[in-house]
């Protein structure tokens, strides 16, 4: 059920044989690495493109970028994974803070509300197979906005500020630059970013984050206001500023990233993975289609709107978390391999329906971090 996809000559043949809808004009260019420009709005109220072959700018075997893709415009936004620290939920009915789970951050609740108390490093607050999911040190990779251990590591921010505790935060790692062997990835070889103590409180509907180094007896603060146009507001503590990461919530559908997931070995532990694909929980739905390697491509070609029940809510009823694609499109045991028995159906926030399958996860040299996928508008 698996095959190595190491031959870009095959991709070239496929490109040459595509229909007019998938010809060279629809082979989408990569943006400059690290671009953070917001996507431009479409002049049409209902946006759609026919699709094509797509190369997300993941950035190679260190996978330095989070890449957000709008299928309806063909635009992507690539942002360096270590450019942000915390993200603040913009839901008008909730107050949640998430860690940067793309650089192995972790957090432990302390039994104090005094941010100026001196704290010590706790080496157990890490991402890895020694850290059980039940400890609640990381955010749920499924995107659940409930309290840990099945939701966010930082508890929901209360209106009663005396209920908002200080957290000991392992700030994770800078994106590394070490070049791994061909076919491998190097995701956490960068410099450790140290430790912080952090407390988040509320001022009306705004967030206020208090933060300091562990031994400091004074702290800094930032106030974060929600944006109705976005899922989250992101901040960088070192700069003391907000930073642009996700595009507006209506302007991306899927994202390629490295991130902390759960793994059963045999208990459920935290584990860091590359080549992960998530989808936007605000309006996007995904369904995985499992077939077999002999018929997958024929079934993909034949799949149309009617096959997807015209995108009904019932058809997408299992799309309840952001990891429907996740890592289910590839396998890395014995080398970088695609699973050639699956494809995916995606409904974007405008109601457009797409089918998507993966064509490669490596470049012509066999290096990971260069995925290619094909997607087509359902008709």
Give the ranges of each region predicted by the language model:
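Sec-dependent N-terminal signal peptides
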Residues: 6-10
């Amino acid at each position: 059920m698996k095959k190595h996809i190491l031959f870009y000559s095959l991709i070239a043949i496929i490109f040459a044989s595509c229909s007019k809808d998938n010809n060279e004009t629809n082979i989408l260019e990569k943006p400059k690495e690290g671009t953070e420009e917001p996507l431009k709005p479409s002049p049409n109220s209902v946006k759609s493109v026919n699709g094509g072959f797509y190369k997300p700018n993941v950035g190679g075997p260190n996978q330095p970028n989070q890449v957000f893709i709008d299928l309806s415009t063909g635009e992507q936004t690539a942002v360096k994974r270590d450019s942000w620290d915390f993200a603040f939920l913009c839901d008008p009915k909730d107050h949640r803070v998430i860690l940067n789970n793309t650089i192995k951050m972790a957090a432990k609740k302390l039994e104090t509300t005094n941010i100026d108390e001196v704290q010590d490093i706790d080496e157990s607050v890490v991402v890895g197979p020694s850290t059980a999911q039940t400890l609640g040190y990381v955010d749920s990779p499924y995107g659940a906005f409930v309290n840990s251990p099945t939701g966010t590591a930082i508890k929901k921010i209360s209106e009663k500020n005396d209920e908002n505790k200080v957290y000991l935060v392992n700030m994770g790692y800078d994106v590394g630059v070490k070049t791994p062997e061909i076919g491998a990835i190097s995701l956490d070889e960068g410099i450790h970013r140290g430790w912080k103590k952090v407390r988040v409180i509320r001022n009306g509907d705004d967030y206020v984050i208090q933060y300091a180094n562990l031994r400091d007896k004074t702290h800094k603060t930032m106030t974060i206001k929600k944006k109705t146009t976005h899922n989250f507001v992101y901040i960088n503590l070192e700069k003391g500023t907000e930073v642009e990461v996700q595009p507006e919530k209506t302007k991306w559908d899927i994202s390629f990233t490295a991130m902390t997931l759960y793994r059963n070995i045999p208990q459920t532990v935290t584990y860091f993975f590359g080549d992960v694909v998530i989808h936007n929980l605000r309006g996007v739905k995904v369904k995985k289609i499992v077939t077999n390697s002999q018929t997958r491509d024929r079934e993909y070609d034949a799949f149309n709107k009617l096959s997807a029940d015209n995108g009904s809510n019932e058809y997408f009823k299992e799309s309840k978390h952001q990891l429907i694609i996740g890592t289910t499109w590839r396998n890395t045991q014995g080398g970088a391999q695609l699973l050639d028995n699956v494809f995916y159906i995606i409904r974007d926030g405008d109601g457009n329906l797409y089918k998507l399958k993966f064509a490669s996860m490596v470049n012509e040299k066999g290096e990971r971090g260069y995925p290619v996928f094909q997607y087509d508008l359902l008709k």
